[in-house]
Amino acid sequence: LPMAEREFQRRYPSISDVIARAWRAKDWFLIWGPPGTGKTSTAMRALVDLAMAKPGMRILLLAYTYRATDEICKMLEARMKVAGQENDVYLRLGNPLKCAPTLRGRMPPMMDFDNSIAVLEYSSNVRIVVSTVSSLAPHNPVFGIFKHFDMAVVDEASQLLDTHILPLF
């Protein structure tokens, strides 16, 4: 793990073993738990912390709903505030009308969103891209989204069918 084992366990004592196994997974890893158990607020944040500690690593964070992507963005905002990071760490894709007003500044201009090349250019300047699966899917055939990321995390994956995710690969 990039950070000292003791520091990692201090930050995430209840799930440090699960996160370590997810981080080391070769292809995919499933974290399942009932609502409110910290899958987004703790597990996803821990994986983001690990990825951000690795220079140049790019992360794709996906969710089924706009509300879930708002929660991911709020987690990232809190993480950036604590870490004292600059504002260009992540980009939010999707419809601005369905995004929390406080997060709309993280989105590319709507006129550029329909242009997959513009989306690729916007996303190449950040380390983290957050999107719903449906907002991301139209751009995948143009430039193969997953070829540009080192790790993808899908929140609330049980709400998605395989047919929603598999075309992205």
Spans of model-derived segments:
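Conserved P-loop NTPase motor core of helicases/translocases
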Residues: 1-4, 48, 56-152
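Motif I (Walker A/P-loop) of helicase-class P-loop NTPases
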Residues: 40-48, 73, 163
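Walker A (P-loop) phosphate-binding loop of P-loop NTPases
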Residues: 36
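GG-anchored amphipathic helix commonly corresponding to the ABC/SMC/Rad50 NBD signature/C-loop
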Residues: 18-24, 134-138, 162, 169
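A structural signal for short coil/turn segments at secondary-structure junctions
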Residues: 26, 54-55
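N-terminal pre-P-loop "Q-motif" helix
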Residues: 6-27, 42, 131
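SF2 helicase catalytic motif II
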Residues: 146-165
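Short hydrophobic/aromatic beta-strand immediately N-terminal to the Walker A/P-loop
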Residues: 29-32, 60
